[in-house]
Every structure is written in C-alpha cells, then in structure tokens.
Design a protein with these regions (language model features):
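Hydrophobic, aromatic-rich transmembrane alpha-helices
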Residues: 109, 201, 281-327, 334-335
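Perimembrane helix-loop-helix junctions
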Residues: 3-7, 160, 167, 192-224, ...
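Short helix- or helix-capping micro-motifs
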Residues: 28-34, 127-135, 139, 159, ...
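Luminal/periplasmic acceptor-recognition loop/helix of membrane-associated glycosyltransferases
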Residues: 436-439, 450-505, 514-533
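Hydrophobic/aromatic-rich transmembrane helices and adjacent perimembrane loops
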Residues: 53, 140-141, 147, 186-188, ...
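Membrane-embedded, lumen/periplasm-facing catalytic core of multi-pass transferases
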Residues: 395-449, 453-462, 475, 528, ...
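Short acidic/glycine- and proline-prone juxtamembrane loop motifs at membrane-interface regions
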Residues: 46, 71, 136, 142-149
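Signature aromatic-anchored transmembrane alpha helix within multi-pass, membrane-resident enzymes
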Residues: 25-28, 178, 195-198, 217-224, ...
C-alpha cells in the first residue's frame, strides 16, 4: 500500500534559517571571530561594567537592597542576564562578556533579513559584512555594556515590523513590541523606536488595522503587571524598572542645561587673564548649538568608520528610488529621530560615546545596502567587470581596511591594576570583603577585582568613603578615618596624591603601614600599596 505523503508546512523559525545562505553564515562567523579576538585582548573591565556585575552579584544573592546603592539609579536587563549566565559558566566576567558577544553577533541575522527585502542576496551579504567588521560594533560587542543587548532587540523588532504583512501579522507585531520593550529595558533610549513604530502604524492605515495596533500595544499592559509583581517580591518601586522620570527629563533637561552652559560661559569672559578670550567666549556662547552639531558629526564619522561612510551616502539615492514603499519611510524616520535624540543628548550632557550611534546605524542598514548596490553597479560599468569579481574584491577590501583597527589591542597596560588587586586579595583574610583606600581614578578597578572571586555580594566598587580625596590632610586624622571606615589597604598614587601635610615619607616612616608592592602606570605615575596595620585590620 502506498504511503500517504503529508505536506507539512515549515515552521517560521526554520524558514528564517533557510533564508540565510552559507556565505551569509560565513560572514556572521567572521563577525563572531573578530569579536572573540577583541574579547580575548580586552584586558580590563570598563568602569560601568563593574557596576553591572556588582548588581548581578546582588541579584544572584537575592540581596535586593544592594541593587541601587552603588552609583546606578536604575536596574536594566543586563544584570539579570549576567546572573543567569553565571549559573551556566560560574565566572562573572565570562558571563558578562558572553552576553555582549552573543547579542552583538546575533544582531547580524535580523539585519541581513531586513536588507534582503530590498536588495539581492549578494548585496545583502556585503552589507552585513560591513556591520560584522565595523570597529565600533566589534569592540563594543565584548565590553560589559548594555548596548549590544539593545542592538539585537532593536534589529529584531525592526525586522518584525517590516515583515508584518504576512498571515502571522499579529504575531510579528507582538514580537516587535516585545523586542522594543526589551531593548528599552537595556537602553532606555530605545523606547524611541516604540514611539516611532506606533506613529508609523497609525500613519500607514492602508496596511494597518485596528487590531494590529492593539496587538502592538498589548505587551505594555503585561509589562505593567509584571512590574507590580516585581515590586511585591523585591521591594522595588515601579520607577526602578521603567525609568519614566528619566524619559520625561529628556525633553526638559537639555533646555535647562543649555541655559546653564550659556550663563557659565558669560561668567568666564571676565575671569580669564587672556584678553582674546573676551572676544572668543561670546562667540562660543552664541553658537553652542553649532558646536553640538559639529560634535555629533565628528562622532558620526568615527562611529560609522570613515571608509564605510561612502556606502551610506551612496545609498541615499536608493531610498528616493523606493520612496513609494512606506517601510523605507519608517526606517528613515527611525534614523533621523535617532540622530536628533543624540543631538539633544549632546546639548544636555556633552558626553557622546561612539557606541551610542548604534541606534542610528541599525535603521540606516538599508541605506548601506543601497549604497553597496550602487557602488557595485558603478564599478561593473566603468571597468566592465564580472559581478562575481566585483563582489569578492569588495569583500576583501571591506575586511582589509577594517582589520588593522579590529586587531589592535587596547589598554593592555591597565593590567597593572588587576595585579594590584590580586596582591590585595592575597594579603586579605579569606572571609572578609576587601576595602582599599585609593583615588577616585582607580577605586572602581581595585575594589572590583580585589573582591571579584569572594563569596557574597561585594562592597560597592565606587564608594566615595574609600576615596582618600575626601580624607583629612593630616597623618593622624587620615589613619583614624581608615579605622572608622574599616579600610585594610592604602594605594598611594604619585599623580593623584593631593595632600600637602601628609606625604609619601609619612606613610613609609609610620608603623601603621606596611609596604606590599610597587607599580607604575602612565596615568597615575608610581603606585605603592600599603597594608594598614592595627588591631582592627
């Protein structure tokens, strides 16, 4: 008897995998290997990362009180993921870097699926190669920061929105909403994508039904109830989780800071001994907005990587060609709103890191794809080259021009701070948490690494009570402050030691201190570690 052949539909998840050809998978593997290399050659944790790991330790120990007592006023998704990863690998640093690595690499998959909606597979492959090797994305995909988590969920959310015109439209919109909320939990700025997407759905009424909008908004209610449950079990407030006050402050604070900056510059005009400053500062005061714009432009070019910027600019014409496609209008709105937000952020804080431009790069991926397509057409026509030859030439060039920057090892000299922390840990009692008096410049690294492998939630690695800048300039009073705060060690730093009545000779000549070792770093000068002698230490 002939067997009946069943026509089983391939699940959507498997269809997504089938859409990724071998070459695209190889590009993702290249991106992964570059990130692994960067991770293996990243010597020391970034300062923010120490605070996230400290929060993760508190979560692991169910020490909810310590979650917001150490510099950070919010609780993002990252510490929870680190705590989960620690249960698998039993190493805090490995867990934190592993999460960034996975998310920073996985974002390439939805980006490929996005650009494949408009360009051929070969051009889509070259586009994600650009994202796989962009130095800012590579280096920050192994740092202990929240951005890679946000990048992945933003990419996945955008893909779900532009792919919503399928029989599973409600499922895609629900997934998009969850992705944007997850991204916002990692980086609060990502809530902008939620707002722009809602505006887009309301605008594109031709392809959007009322139920679509309801499905998109439904996770907000679920998140609200989960937040209430979290409050009941952990004692946290709703504001600890959604950071609503910070979102509202983004609209008001830049205006206030702009006025404060203008007033400060006005005061400086008469306080400088240089007569030319009297004419220079009023010009600066009147053009603060222009300086902020120049700052954003500079960081934009650096973050996107100068050689790769040409792809994005060439792709602008491609957007005009498909202007009837409302999905491109959506991506353009995301890109421009991201740039606008970074400009406002600059006016507010004047701190603009390269990694912040991830929220601009992601929606601009289609612009890069159009630019890649146009560049290949130009090269093929001008030199009458075969498309496959142009493909592999560009493939090699893209990797080649980015490789020197991606293989460069940074901050290797900072391993000296880990050596100091290891020395402290060896000379401290096994059961006790370690507290060391240092300058504010080194406190977070020394405290973090000295307590990293000790049981329980460690002390805050950014506690001003352990920074000797706030101590009295008197040997006896200094020693009393150490005893009051329970500090077991003192790190003298040549360039940061501010005391006049309390010098290195007082430390070395006192029976209260015992020298343990000497080190040197260009930022601190010579460093000498002392153990604090006494009945309480």
């Amino acid at each position: 008897m002939q067997k009946e052949v069943l026509n089983v539909e391939t699940p959507e998840g498997l269809r997504i995998i089938e859409r990724i050809p071998v070459t695209a998978g190889s590009v993702i593997l290249i991106g992964f290997m570059l990130r692994v290399w960067a991770g293996l050659h990243t010597v020391i944790v970034n300062p923010d990362g120490a605070l996230y790991i400290q929060q993760a330790m508190a979560i692991h120990d169910k020490n909810w009180i310590s979650l917001k007592t150490c510099a950070l006023t919010f609780i993002s998704a990252y510490p929870f993921l680190i705590a989960v990863g620690y249960r698998l690998v039993h190493d805090w640093m490995l867990s934190a870097r592993m999460i960034s690595l996975i998310c920073g690499t996985a974002m390439l998959i939805p980006l490929y699926l996005i650009v494949k909606e408009w360009v051929r597979k070969d051009n889509a492959i070259l586009t994600i190669l650009v994202f796989a090797v962009t130095p800012v994305l590579v280096s920050n995909s192994v740092e202990v920061i929240r951005d890679p988590i946000g990048w992945f969920f933003l990419s996945a959310g955008i893909w779900a929105v532009i792919h919503r015109n399928t029989p599973c439209r409600h499922g895609f919109l629900l997934a998009a909403s969850l992705c944007f909320l997850a991204a916002a939990w990692a980086r609060i700025e990502s809530i902008l994508f939620m707002a722009i997407t809602l505006a887009y759905l309301l605008y594109d009424r031709k392809n959007t039904k009322t139920m679509d909008i309801l499905f998109f908004l439904s996770p907000l209610l679920v998140i609200f109830f989960f937040s209430l449950a979290g409050m009941m079990f952990s004692g946290l407030t709703l504001g600890d989780l959604h950071r609503g006050k910070e979102i509202a402050g983004k609209f008001i604070e830049p205006i206030r800071q702009y006025r404060l900056m203008a007033d400060s510059l006005k005061t400086l005009v008469w306080s400088s001994p240089n007569p030319f400053v009297e004419f220079f500062l009023p010009e600066v005061r009147n053009h603060i907005w222009l300086i902020a714009m120049g700052t954003v432009l500079n960081r934009f070019l650096e973050a996107f990587f100068y050689p790769f910027v040409v792809f994005y600019f060439l792709g602008l014409s491609g957007i005009r060609k498909y202007r009837s496609d409302t999905r491109l209008l959506y991506l353009t709105a995301l890109t421009l709103s991201g740039l606008s937000m970074l400009y406002v952020h600059t006016l507010q804080t004047w701190m603009l890191y390269y990694r912040f431009f991830g929220i601009v790069m992601i929606p601009a991926v289609v612009c890069c794809a159009f630019g890649m397509e146009k560049l290949r057409d130009i090269i093929s026509r001008k030199w009458s080259s075969e498309p496959v030859i142009v493909f592999w030439v560009l493939f090699i060039v893209i990797i080649g021009i980015s490789l020197p920057k991606n293989l460069k090892s940074g901050d290797t000299d900072k391993s000296v701070f880990i050596q100091i922390a290891d020395t402290i840990s060896r000379h401290a009692p096994d059961a006790a948490a370690i507290k060391t008096a240092t300058s504010r410049h080194t406190q977070i690294w020394i405290s973090f690494y000295a307590n990293l492998h000790r049981a329980g939630t460690p002390p805050c690695p950014l506690d001003e009570a352990n920074c000797w800048e706030f101590y009295p300039d008197d040997p006896a009073l200094f020693r009393n402050r150490l005893r009051q705060n329970g500090l077991q060690f003192v790190l003298w730093e040549e360039k940061h030691w501010l005391f006049h009545n309390f010098s290195l000779s007082d430390l070395m000549g006192s029976a209260d201190y015992r020298e343990l070792g000497r080190w040197h770093h260009r930022d601190t000068g010579q460093m000498i570690l002392f153990a604090v002698n006494g009945p309480n230490n």
